[in-house]
């Protein structure tokens, strides 16, 4: 079960308010001696408010609710941000959990506006949501984008409008077709030409273009689990199960915290990725219930 006291101590430690309203989200400590805050436009900005909402859900402690509201409100400008696919989980982790636990109309409207902006990054000719607006690619789509689909599913439920869900599932279908190899490992980046053909398959964070970046495999597993939950399409279930089987075969560590890339050398000094393990565990728990 949860060590609630330990979780609460970590969150209390990280409640820091900076002078710059755009740099208020604690990210990590350096040996416990220095605190870093990143911009609200960083892709992880919704995680800390989301953690506070979960702490409130677990404990009922009103202080966590108060802090969750405060740190969620700092992200309110993101409802108008159109510059990345990551607005999906930046807002869903924060505002999504806020509305789930304490529904108010302003939060609902922020979620709908964000979903509309995310839909604006969808290209119907390609069948995908564009990930980045930088770099050398024509229309880059990264496997991480599967995590942003939950916002579209959620807003479909909020509004009763299936257009969000249908767009998300189309993205998932295109990604399933082009991102995955025969063994169900995935490329990190697939870039498309304007006519929908593939321009390039490569990596931006993995060890090499044809390796299996650990967090990327976890993103895919989580995303296709969500897609099956929302659609009951057996193809998505098979995809999730096959990705899970790949991960189980490839994990080389006794504690199941993988090397940062499944093709990285299995040596003591090779970094490991606890976030990949956490995402995988969360996906497997949900997959076991479907």
Give the location of each predicted region.
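Glycan-recognition and catalytic cores of secretory/periplasmic carbohydrate-active enzymes
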Residues: 1-290
């Amino acid at each position: 079960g949860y060590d609630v006291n330990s979780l609460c101590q970590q969150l209390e430690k990280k409640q820091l308010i900076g002078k710059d309203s755009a740099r208020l989200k604690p990210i990590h400590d350096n040996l416990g001696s220095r605190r870093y805050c990143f911009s609200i436009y960083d892709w992880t900005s919704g995680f800390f408010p989301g953690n506070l909402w979960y702490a409130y859900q677990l404990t009922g402690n009103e202080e966590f609710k108060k802090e969750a509201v405060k740190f969620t409100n700092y992200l309110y400008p993101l409802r108008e941000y159109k510059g990345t696919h990551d607005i999906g989980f930046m807002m869903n982790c924060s505002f999504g959990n806020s509305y789930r636990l304490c529904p108010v109309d302003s939060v609902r409207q922020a979620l709908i506006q964000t979903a509309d902006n995310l839909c604006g990054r969808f290209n119907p000719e390609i069948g995908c949501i564009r990930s980045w607006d930088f770099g050398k690619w024509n229309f880059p789509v990264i496997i991480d984008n599967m995590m942003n689909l939950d916002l579209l599913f959620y807003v479909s439920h909020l509004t009763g409008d299936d257009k969000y869900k249908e767009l998300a599932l189309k993205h998932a279908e295109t990604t399933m077709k082009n991102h995955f190899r025969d063994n169900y490992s995935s490329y990190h980046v697939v870039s498309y030409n304007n006519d929908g053909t593939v321009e390039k398959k490569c990596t931006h964070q993995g060890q090499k273009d044809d390796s299996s970046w650990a967090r990327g495999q976890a993103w895919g597993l989580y995303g296709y689990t969500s897609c099956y939950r929302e659609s009951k399409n057996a193809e998505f279930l098979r995809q999730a199960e096959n990705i899970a089987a790949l991960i189980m075969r490839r994990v080389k560590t006794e504690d199941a915290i993988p090397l940062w890339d499944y093709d990285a050398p299995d040596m003591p000094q090779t970094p490991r990725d606890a976030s990949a393990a956490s995402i995988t565990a969360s996906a497997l728990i949900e997959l076991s219930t479907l």
